[in-house]
Amino acid sequence: MGKIIGIDLGTTNSCVAVMDGKNARVIENGEGDRTTPSIVAYAQDGEILVGQPAKRQAVTNSQNTLFAIKRLIGRRFEDAEVQRDVSIMPYKIIKADNGDAWVEARNEKMAPPQVSAEVLKKMKKTAEDYLGEPVTEAVITVPAYFNDAQRQATKDAGRIAGLDVKRIINEPTAAALAYGLDREVGNRTIAVYDLGGGTFDISIIEIDEVDGEKTYEVLSTNGDTHLGGEDFDSRLINYLVDEFKKEQGIDLRNDPLAMQRLKEAAEKAKIELSSAQQTDVNLPYVTADATGPKHLNIKVTRAKLESLVEDLVKRSMDPVKVALEDAGLKVSEVNDVILVGGQTRMPMVQKTVAEFFGKEPRKDVNPDEAVAMGAAVQGGVLAGDVKDVLLLDVTPLSLGIETMGGVMTSLIAKNTTIPTKHSQVFSTAEDNQSAVTIHVLQGERKRASDNKSLGQFNLDGIQPAPRGMPQIEVTFDIDADGILHVSAKDKNSGREQNITIKASSGLNEEEIQKMVRDAEANAEADRKFEELVQTRNQADQLVHGTRKQIEEAGDKLAANDKEAIEKALSELEIASKGEDKAAIEAKLQALVEASKPLLEIAQQQAQAGAGNTADATDAGAKKDDDVVDAEFEEVDGKDKK
């Protein structure tokens, strides 16, 4: 059985880890980095770039460079959060036929799981390069506050990338697993504050250790799936745009190229201000008008940045209070606070969390890597490599159905340990009703329409009876991934209907299979492209080497041979510019054949050279016989010895 890898599929960066003996090891990617930007770019020649290469070309290809896709996964186009992103993202967010938020690049419409699959493929390849064997199974993390639709969409992304997703695990829970892996923790209650690139989570977790066996029980979880580092960046970008407009009278929002440069500069400035009190945002030639080029140079202090994002940091504390209340704990009962996610490096975030909990957060957990490491631990548990670890996670939001009067009736309350199953009997609202619609909802509001609709199905064939008489048993079954299966059964007739709640990413099985096939076709195309490039490189080397040999041969090469070689060289150079690998290989072989006279000349020169060397050696030896050994003095400074 191969390794089950752990992947932290982040909004801004992604990370992959694997169990190496008893420890989780983060794997460096092809660029030598331990994290990979979650950025996918579609180049003009059809090439798909992922990670750092995609980030590097974003300035000149902003409309086809997709980032922060996780904020769209499993969401409807009409969602308020999506509409907010539509107005600020440089790429196109569109409404799919089924009402979901999709994206468009190079005139191709794509579902967010399709784009995320490209990042997962890079993570998969990173692991395969390190392990030296194919990887087919993974544990992928999601924000704890992701709803059912977002979890299913993440699972779909894994399938499109060619991965069998063994488990979807909550990010804070994964961080807790990493924290407890190599520590004697005893019995402790920890708070995991996870502020990443696009999402925020807080989980209160109890770790019990008995005879070396650790049980991680999530007591409660809460969060905001649209609050993260990207929002902090946006505040700083808007400030810089407004300042530049005051100085120069030009609104950079109308210039996509300038905005992309500004985005990179703002992100860099934000990071610098975590360690420095002040930084310069300096962008020469950021734009131009009739009077000439314009340069942006604005000083930003840490205090200024903090004033811009203060309300965002405060906003993150509301879910923290709710999570503690749901867990039935006082602040003083939390033993340790763990910070996860790159945005927690901001001093203001650390200070706010420390003040709330009355203790300094732990600094010995890497905020960028802990989640992937925890996912690898869970992979090890599932593979049987890691023993003595039991994980009890929870469902983040209440689940129920719409009942008479547009009310949501909960069947499973939020923070219920999963997997779990719950049944409840309902009846008809009208006399002789022959069918009922089961409308499945997720959320905490009483009004059904205020909650997230996960899907609906009909149970028909109910025998005519007065209202309230038929007995319809509705069963909710949540698996270990937090994904919901719903069934409804007419207890009188025995008729049953069930549904696995599909993500509102709306990808049906056929669409997923098509995307899987497309991904496989791309992998084949990538392999062929790589082989073509290798053949071109061979051709270039041979052309270079042959020209050098022609030069060295000089007059020794017959004119007709030289002409034949030059012709073969020219044909190979033309073939190398094409896309036909077989044609390049044929011309390579033709040049090798035509160059045989050059090989003969080189051999003759080598033999002649060897003969001359032998003569010189004999003469040297004869000369040595006449040499007299001289006496010598070793001189050190002025003293003779």
UniProtKB/Swiss-Prot annotation:
Keyword Acetylation: no
Bias-annotated ranges (Low complexity): 604-619
Superkingdom per UniProt: Bacteria
Positions carrying Phosphothreonine: T199
Gene3D superfamilies tied to this protein: 1.20.1270.10, 3.30.420.40, Actin, Chain A, domain 4, Substrate Binding Domain Of DNAk, Chain A, domain 1
Keyword Chaperone in record: yes
Segments of this protein annotated with the region Disordered: 604-641
Induction: By stress conditions e.g. heat shock.
UniProt keywords, alphabetically: ATP-binding, Chaperone, Nucleotide-binding, Phosphoprotein, Stress response
GO molecular function: ATP binding; ATP-dependent protein folding chaperone; unfolded protein binding
SUPFAM superfamilies: Actin-like ATPase domain, Heat shock protein 70kD (HSP70), C-terminal subdomain, Heat shock protein 70kD (HSP70), peptide-binding domain
NCBIfam families reported for this sequence: PRK00290.1, PRK05183.1, prok_dnaK
Entry similarity comment: Belongs to the heat shock protein 70 family.
Role according to the record: Acts as a chaperone.
Name of the protein in its database record: Chaperone protein DnaK
